[in-house]
Amino acid sequence: MARAVGIDLGTTNSVVSVLEGGEPTVITNAEGARTTPSVVAFAKNGEVLVGEVAKRQAVTNVDRTIRSVKRHMGTDWKIDLDGKSFNPQQMSAFILQKLKRDAESYLGEKVTDAVITVPAYFNDSERQATKEAGEIAGLNVLRIVNEPTAAALAYGLDKDDQTILVFDLGGGTFDVSLLEIGDGVVEVKATNGDNHLGGDDWDQRVVDYLVKQFANGHGVDLSKDKMALQRLREAAEKAKIELSSSTETTINLPYITASAEGPLHLDEKLTRSQFQQLTADLLDRCKTPFHNVIKDAGIQLSEIDHVVLVGGSTRMPAVAELVKELTGGQEANKGVNPDEVVAIGASLQAGVLKGEVKDVLLLDVTPLSLGIETKGGIMTKLIERNTTIPTKRSEIFTTAEDNQPSVQIQVYQGEREIAAYNKKLGMFELTGLPPAPRGVPQIEVAFDIDANGIMHVAAKDLGTGKEQKMTVTGGSSLPKDEVNRMREEAEKYAEEDHARREAAESRNQGEQLVYQTEKFLKDNEDKVPADVKTEVETAVGELKEKLKGEDSAEIRTATEKVRGRLPRIWARRCTANAQAEGAAPGADAPGDAQAKADDDVVDAEIVDDEKDTKGGAA
């Protein structure tokens, strides 16, 4: 049975985990790291770079590097590159493809099934967009799971009955959830959050501060310089991380820009106190969702048994202090890695769905109320927020006008009394109603939410039996054929990247063989007969000519031709050695060295030459 993985698709970093012998293991990526930056870049040669390699070249390729795409999920955001238009689902699919490849490399088998996590406060369209991203990446998405729920699953599977508060502050989103755990049941009691609050916002405050300081000191506005701004973003992130363990840091960026007088350098000190002042209002925004969760769950602070911090941003001392203050002095649990716990929980849920993990029941909730617009623009709720899913609710509605031939069902998600102030998820029409006075027809509207938090709506005229259904997937939803087209496109990119890697390997092997053969001939000049030497040198010359071009097939053919000549010079050299009494053992033949080199070849992510020559931030 193919194994399923758990994926934490984060705003700034992503993680993939798998169950091995019933225990979750975080998979190390091709670069040797346990987290992969959620960054996608298009190199000058059209190659798609993902992760650390994409992040490293961002300074010299600002316009073609995309980060924090998770903040655009469920929207109509698009970016045009090389004559093609890309949406958030496609960008996320590139990241998921990279995680899928890393998992396949680690496991030595194909990976198709996955559980993907989303912020608890993601609405219907954001969840659907995440599911579509997985499908485009070639994954069968078994379940969309809320991040705090996954974290609680990872933390509390073996714990006794207890109440857990999960405080999840990531790179771009913030959630607070209250869960009850006991007897293998993980039940979410309440959840709240802010989908546009995270570590990126703390970074941006430092960037704004540095731009202001530099303008005051040099009269130059760095916000107008894209490359300088990218260097500032990277420096701001590093400064934020350093200030979690130090009380002061220095941000030093030489040659950040130039003026008429010459190059200008940025050199600023930033203390933890200054940093906390710059970001005090962001910290305050964490308070309201916390209080809402406690209120919705109807519990006292003293009833919370454990506090679990999730997301890299919770490493900031001010955040940890805030959580301690909000929970009445309770210390957060230090037994989980905030970067990895969500992916671990996702892999456990994947194990539950595949039958590898027994006796575990995950009861999640819908984060926002769902309803329809009724007369006067009022939001009539059918499903209240924090309702356990999957669930189904229905209500009877009627017409507002005499002889009304149809009714329009407009579906909304949110907490406001006026429908227009909430998030509109979709609409459809039930037509063919027989003429009748207003208030007479009986129309049953049913909401059905599946375990992924994705909703299906049906409207039925009880008089005629006519019915209309739809899956509410929000404005971002893609038609099935569009998802299939994007999946084929993503596979095409993967094939192109594979071809590029193969071409690079062929070139590397050819160049290595030229070097080793020429060295071997030089070192054994007196032991190789002139006719054999001439034959080999001719083949090497042909290979060198082919290496000047770009035809990989010709390079491979020329390489094999040289390899085919090697046994002859090796045999002649061995004969010469045997005839020379007391001769010391010689060096490896180039064929042997090449074979050894081939054993050591690993897949490398190729980056464009321009990046290498220009270099990154100093």
From Swiss-Prot:
Any one GO MF annotation of this record: unfolded protein binding
Ranges of biased composition (kind: Low complexity): 577-594
Keywords assigned by UniProt, alphabetized: ATP-binding, Chaperone, Nucleotide-binding, Phosphoprotein, Stress response
Disulfide feature: none
Keyword Lipid metabolism: no
Induction behaviour: By stress conditions e.g. heat shock.
InterPro entries, per the entry: ATPase_NBD, Chaperone_DnaK, Heat_shock_70_CS, HSP70_C_sf, HSP70_peptide-bd_sf, Hsp_70_fam
Family matches, as SUPFAM superfamilies: Actin-like ATPase domain, Heat shock protein 70kD (HSP70), C-terminal subdomain, Heat shock protein 70kD (HSP70), peptide-binding domain
Residue(s) carrying Phosphothreonine: T173
Ranges annotated as biased composition (Basic and acidic residues): 489-505
Positions of the UniProt region annotated as Disordered: 489-512, 577-618
Compositional bias per record (Acidic residues), positions renumbered to this chain: 600-610
Record flagged with keyword Nucleotidyltransferase: no
Family: Belongs to the heat shock protein 70 family.
Function recorded in the entry: Acts as a chaperone.
Protein name: Chaperone protein DnaK
Organism: Streptomyces griseus
